[in-house]
Amino acid sequence: HAGGKFDGGGYKVSGGLHGVGASVVNALSTELEVFVHREGKIHYQKYERGIPVADLKVIGDTDQTGTITRFKPDPEIFQETTVYDFDTLATRMRELAFLNRNIKLTIEDKRERKQKKEFHYEGGIKSYVEHLNRSKQPIHEEPVYVEGSKDGIQVEVSLQYNEGYTNNIYSFTNNIHTYEGGTHEVGFKTALTRVINDYGRKNSILKDADSNLTGEDVREGLTAIVSIKHPNPQFEGQTKTKLGNSEARTITESVFSEAFEKFLLENPNVARKIVEKGTMAARARVAAKKARELTRRKSALEVSSLPGKLADCSSKDPAISEIYIVEGDSAGGSAKQGRDRHFQAILPLKGKIINVEKARLDKILSNDEVRTIITAIGTNIGGDFDIEKARYHKVIIMTDADVD
């Protein structure tokens, strides 16, 4: 291997699993050059398809330190493309700059388009949360920031609530985005739920008769970054998308809960807003459950429960059936006249129904037009969604291009 992660002194933490990254890049390149600026000298070596062209040699003096690597992907291996996408690389550079406070990263494209970007964030993951929430309405101005370390594991968490109804939690281990979460994310979520419930009880925001808020309740409108640095990460699988270290859960939970408890005590106005947002989410969850049960009872599989507005087709074969959703009864009338009754169904709806992107599930399901769509298509929603129950394999939405 070429990696420096195994000898104990090269890196404090590393994202590598096997220490073969440079070797793999070398093997997959038609040519690779390395310039190492070290101890006043520039050391150079060139490879072609993984084979050294010559021995390592000194080619000059330098007052800098660092490594320059140039490589050209092998088109015989990468047959689909060897062209790099600037925006994809820039997104990753920005992410790394957020995750490593005060580091400056530059990406420059010297091809025809000629573009260059620099990323440098003094706020680190706190700036990352602000970036993610830039188009939202935060309910507290400053993101919460927590950092601490234990047993060589460093934990950083930043979070901010907004007025939205979805949550965005991004977790990282040694700068690697753990898309599927893992023990560090579980530790954070557990601590968040417990601390908010404890604060709500102690300050009588949650009454004795109230049930505890669920994890789903306290995460509504939350944007959070959980980043840990671990000297020996154990990922589940080769893709590094989920962290498996059990101690990461305990340490993340401990570091975050202690600091977050202190934050809530020192910021009672913000704390109340957070708990009250959770209680509103809990009420909406209960209402949505009732609405879902109502929708479920009106099963789309029962012909008797199909919406009165629906002009159904005569075919019972979903594979050939299609439904046209049109605006208003007048459009519905025209569509009915022009359709083939055998396989084309028409569902006229009011023009402007509800913006489901900005509404809670209980509000969405209390809307007659939305319920009509759910019932007509037949797949149900959320955890009960079943594509096999679709009554039509083609859905055509016919609307004009105005605001509604």
Curated annotation (Swiss-Prot):
Any Pfam family the entry gives: Toprim
Essential cofactor(s): Mg(2+); Mn(2+); Ca(2+)
CDD domains associated with the record: TopoII_Trans_DNA_gyrase
GO CC annotation, single: cytoplasm
Keywords on record: ATP-binding, Cytoplasm, DNA-binding, Isomerase, Magnesium, Metal-binding, Nucleotide-binding, Topoisomerase
Residues of the site described as Interaction with DNA: K352, N355
Binding site for Mg(2+) 2: D400, D402
Record: residues binding Mg(2+) 1: E327, D400
Cofactor binding mode and count: Binds two Mg(2+) per subunit. The magnesium ions form salt bridges with both the protein and the DNA. Can also accept other divalent metal cations, such as Mn(2+) or Ca(2+).
Keyword Electron transport tagged: no
Any one Gene Ontology molecular-function term assigned to this protein's record: metal ion binding
Every Toprim domain range: 321-404
Subcellular location, record wording: Cytoplasm
InterPro entries with a match to the protein in the record: HATPase_C_sf, Ribosomal_Su5_D2-typ_SF, Ribsml_uS5_D2-typ_fold_subgr, Topo_IIA, Topo_IIA-like_dom_sf, Topo_IIA_B, Topo_IIA_B_C, Topo_IIA_bsu_dom2
Biological process (GO), any one: DNA topological change
EC number: 5.6.2.2
Function: A type II topoisomerase that negatively supercoils closed circular double-stranded (ds) DNA in an ATP-dependent manner to modulate DNA topology and maintain chromosomes in an underwound state. Negative supercoiling favors strand separation, and DNA replication, transcription, recombination and repair, all of which involve strand separation. Also able to catalyze the interconversion of other topological isomers of dsDNA rings, including catenanes and knotted rings. Type II topoisomerases break and join 2 DNA strands simultaneously in an ATP-dependent manner.
Quaternary organization: Heterotetramer, composed of two GyrA and two GyrB chains. In the heterotetramer, GyrA contains the active site tyrosine that forms a transient covalent intermediate with DNA, while GyrB binds cofactors and catalyzes ATP hydrolysis.
Other comment: Few gyrases are as efficient as E.coli at forming negative supercoils. Not all organisms have 2 type II topoisomerases; in organisms with a single type II topoisomerase this enzyme also has to decatenate newly replicated chromosomes.
Similarity comment: Belongs to the type II topoisomerase GyrB family.
Protein name: DNA gyrase subunit B
Lineage: Bacteria, Bacillati, Bacillota, Bacilli, Bacillales
Gene symbol of the encoding locus: gyrB
